[in-house]
Amino acid sequence: MEIQAFLNHIRSLRGYQDQIAHIEHLAPRRAVYGDLDAPLNDRLEDSLRAGGVWPLYAHQAEAINHIRAGRNVIIATSSASGKTLCYNVSVMQSLLDDPSTRALYLFPTKALAQDQLRKLHELFSPGLLPPQMMATFDGDTPRSERADVRRYGRIILTNPDMLHIGILPNYQSWAGLLRHLKSVSYTH
């Protein structure tokens, strides 16, 4: 069904009449791609190509360049513009350069963390990183698996609550993460 036909259909439904406040048609924009200051690991670039996310958009390349230069970065772009890839690429490159690297990804909800974990596995596993090295740590993580998350996890996806009640009070158990932590990402 065409978009306009779908909108007309929705408007014609009794329960939706007068509920659609605004419709705006945005003209497509031509993609603007950017270059990295330093090349990525060949396997990482191959993974990005295979995942259909190469070449990088200009804002992604700029953010990755800043992150790789050790600068703090805030990425504020529209939805579905590839913000997540900015830190995923930077973290993965760091892991390939130094396998002791750890990253902590904070999400507001368990569902979003699970969704992002699935995307990480699709793009980077098993070719670049074994699946057990990317894990969620939240209230749903079985107690029997928590030690493995601490031991093998290189990218830990969690939420602020678990950071405060599960990780920071038990900092000695999380020494490997905290000692080698090179990246913290907060998505809201």
Residue map of PLM features:
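Helicase-associated low-complexity/disordered flanking segments
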Residues: 1-58
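Conserved P-loop/Walker A NTP-binding site and adjacent catalytic elements of P-loop NTPases
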Residues: 54-186
